[in-house]
A protein has these predicted regions:
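Metal-dependent phosphoester-hydrolase catalytic domains
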Residues: 108, 165, 169, 176-188, ...
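Short, Asp-centered acidic motifs that coordinate Mg2+ and/or phosphate
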Residues: 26, 62-63, 152, 187-189, ...
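N-terminal, active-site-proximal structural segment of metallo-dependent hydrolase catalytic domains
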Residues: 2-5, 16-80, 91-97, 172, ...
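Structured beta-strand-rich core segments of catalytic domains in phosphoester-bond hydrolases
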Residues: 63-151, 155, 254-255
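Acidic/histidine-rich helix-loop elements
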Residues: 30-50, 119-133, 160, 227, ...
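Active-site metal-binding loops of divalent metal-dependent hydrolases
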Residues: 32-33, 157-159, 193-194, 269
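Active-site neighborhood of phospho(di)ester-bond hydrolases with catalytic His/Asp-centered motifs
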Residues: 65-67, 88-89, 189-193, 212-215
Length: 277
């Protein structure tokens, strides 16, 4: 009887471990943090940065993709998020220009490979694509979850705000990168500020290639992600997204949180997602 009990306990432990590994969950946030610019006056970075960090720490994502971060903002965020490592470079090359950086929890997530490419006809070098106003980049991180060793790939991007053709072609640059690197069968997250509404062609193309969790986790009005620092915004544009492939999404939400003084931490709303690997 004692041997039988030990056998049953061993089986139950094995099943428990197997289930835990098969349902390993990670969380991610995409967040355009708004660049540091004095013309924002009351909404300038120095007035927002502490509250923005508090929001991130409260949500506690395993992976954080940010857009529009200048080098001084990257330095501040990196110093505040001590449990995270950062990958990415400025859109003008090296430490220059805005980052579309990815932060990841070093104790839970292992970095396997990273690269940055430009959304242009010459993705390997700093460059402006098509009718874009500015250099635009995508940061790629190939990661594995430490306890399960399960691999996943994150694309964090910021599309141009002016160039319609550039936004359309930016999707194809990302899709080509996925195909050329044989990522198509892997667990993929594509996220960022795409400066496009759901009915625009770039988002329709992304929705045809990936899953849009928003569909299965409806957001009550205001359903958008761009508040423009407007305090009474009732109907925000949805221009920030998280798309997934080969992943089960268990939670998706927009984080409508304000600072103690009732101002927004950024002119964009962060998006939170939780997935089973």
């Amino acid at each position: 009887m004692r041997k039988l009990s030990l056998f049953i306990l061993t089986c139950l432990l094995f099943i428990s471990i197997s289930c835990s590994e098969s349902n390993q969950t990670i969380s991610l946030i995409t967040y355009n943090i708004r660049l540091d610019i004095e013309s924002d006056v009351i909404n300038k970075w120095d007035n927002r940065k502490e509250g923005l960090i508090s929001l991130i720490k409260e949500e506690n994502p395993d992976v954080l993709g940010i857009q529009e971060a200048l080098p001084n903002q990257i330095e501040y965020i990196s110093n505040q998020l001590e449990d995270y490592n950062m990958i990415g470079e400025g859109r003008d090359g090296g430490d220059n220009g805005e980052y579309s950086a990815i932060y990841y929890k070093s104790g839970k997530i292992r970095l396997e490979k990273t690269e940055t490419f430009w959304l242009s006809e010459s993705p390997e070098i700093p460059s402006i694509g098509w009718d874009a106003a500015l250099n635009r980049i995508t940061t790629v991180g190939v990661f594995s979850e430490v306890s399960s060793n399960k691999k996943f790939i994150v694309y964090n991007s910021h599309f141009d705000h002016i160039g319609k053709i550039a936004r359309e072609n930016s999707v194809n640059v990302i899709l080509n990168h996925i195909r050329e690197n044989n990522h198509i069968k892997n667990r993929i997250i594509v996220m960022g500020d795409f400066n496009a509404s759901p009915n625009d062609s770039p988002i329709r193309l992304l929705s045809s290639e990936f899953d849009d969790p928003y569909i299965n986790f409806p957001i009550k009005n205001p359903f958008g992600t761009f508040n423009g620092f407007e305090l009474d915004s009732k109907s925000m544009e949805r221009i920030d997204y998280i798309f997934t492939s080969n992943l089960k999404v268990v939670d998706y939400r927009h984080i409508y949180k304000r600072l103690p003084n009732n101002l927004w931490p950024s002119d964009h709303i962060p998006i939170f997602i939780s997935v089973n690997l």
